[in-house]
A protein has these predicted regions:
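Early extracytoplasmic/lumenal segment of secretory-pathway proteins
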Residues: 25-97
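Extracytoplasmic ligand-binding site segments that recognize negatively charged/polar headgroups
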Residues: 37, 41-48, 84-85, 90-227
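A ligand-binding cleft/hinge motif common to bilobed small-molecule-binding domains
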Residues: 94-98, 233-253
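Periplasmic-binding protein-like
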Residues: 115, 134, 205-209, 250-274
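Extracellular/periplasmic bilobal clamshell ligand-binding domains
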Residues: 315-352
Length: 352
């Protein structure tokens, strides 16, 4: 009889512990040690190492593959159903929409923290959930240009002669920030009857944009040009979390335009790859990684702006200010469907 009672009590204990595990949410959701392969463009500057070590503390066993956003996208496309990837995070709305269209991601039930994310950033159909937001800025060195002297919006660069040669012109169009900038310009000129969905006025604007800039030197960042006395460049594109890092590195004080139409946002998200063989563990990781606790720690470590509003208090004041700029109204599905063709046309016809 005692053995039966002991067995019953043991069974009750196991079931109770299982129920508690199922009830856990956010950062309380622990990993089981099943290996997850993660692709990201957000692993540089120590991010991948930090995440691997922090996740291990809570039972997750991560293998992280870090490449540029476009390279991650292309790797997933090329590998197809043979991809070892379980989870992908980072990227931007352009790439997310392309991966959705290619049926590479799987829609999942909303994690417990989804409602804590700023409105409009999560995919409405559950394919990805936002973790970090980056404002894509028209930045300048405020030590050399006052707010009154600086451009107020991108068209000022080619419409006002005083800015000619003073802004950088990209020589590669594969980067996520560059493509967000181009999307922010071209979608002001949407015309269903125009070439690639853009009006003649829009293509003329892009032509002027590239005609009057100073081509960036390969491998030389914007801020290195700003502090170089032999370079005319004072203005260019920058993502919000990069501004603080470069200010500290170069002794520059970033100023930035606040256009009436708003600015593009690169929404870094987290998603599960459709072909994963470790779905349950992947879902546990998504629940853990996007939580206010973990995203707050990530923000403190890397000066990012969390999409999770409960984690936002951990962000630097400068990030809160930059990411308070309203988001530009952009049809990201339209952009995802056309960005490659737009960039090809620009490279062939407008880049010097």
């Amino acid at each position: 009889m005692k053995k039966i009672v002991a067995l019953i009590l043991a069974l009750v204990f196991v079931l109770s512990m299982s129920a508690l595990a199922d009830a856990a949410t956010g950062a309380d959701v622990k990993g089981t040690g099943v290996e997850l392969t993660i692709y990201t463009n957000s692993g540089s500057s120590g991010r991948a190492d930090w995440l691997k070590e922090r996740a291990a503390q809570d039972g997750y066993n991560l293998t992280i593959v870090e490449e540029g956003a476009g390279a991650v996208q292309q790797r997933l496309i090329n590998e197809g159903e043979a991809t070892p990837c379980d989870v992908v995070f980072g990227l931007n709305a352009i790439i997310w929409n392309d991966l959705i269209a290619r049926d590479i991601l799987v829609a999942i039930d909303a994690p417990s923290w989804a409602d804590e994310v700023s409105e409009g950033l999560n995919d409405p159909n559950g394919y990805y959930y936002a973790i970090v937001k980056q404002a894509i800025l028209l930045a300048y060195d405020s030590n050399q240009l006052s707010p009154e002297e600086a451009p107020k919006d991108w068209p000022d660069l080619w419409e006002k002669e005083e800015f000619w040669t003073k802004y950088e012109s990209q020589i590669k169009l594969t980067g996520g920030t560059t493509r967000n900038v181009l999307a922010g310009i071209l979608t002001r000129y949407v015309d269903p009857d125009g070439e690639l969905g853009i009006s003649e006025e829009g293509w003329n604007a892009i032509g002027e944009f590239f005609a009057h800039g100073t081509p960036v030197e390969d491998g030389v960042d914007l801020y290195a040009q700003m502090v170089n006395e032999n370079s005319p460049v004072l203005i260019g594109q920058m993502w919000s979390s990069g501004a603080d890092q470069y200010d500290e590195q170069y002794g520059v004080k970033t100023g930035y335009a606040v256009p009436e139409v708003g600015v593009p946002y690169a929404v870094e998200g987290v998603a599960i790859v459709k072909t994963t063989k470790n779905f349950d563990e992947a879902q546990r990781f998504v629940e853990w990684f996007g939580s206010a606790q973990i995203q707050g720690e990530w923000s403190e470590q890397f000066k990012t702006m969390p999409a999770n509003e409960l984690a936002a208090e951990k962000a630097p004041a400068s990030q809160i200010e930059m990411c308070s700029i309203p988001a530009q109204d952009i049809d990201w599905a339209l952009v995802a469907a056309n960005i490659d063709a737009w960039c090809e046309k620009i490279m062939l016809e407008y880049m010097q």
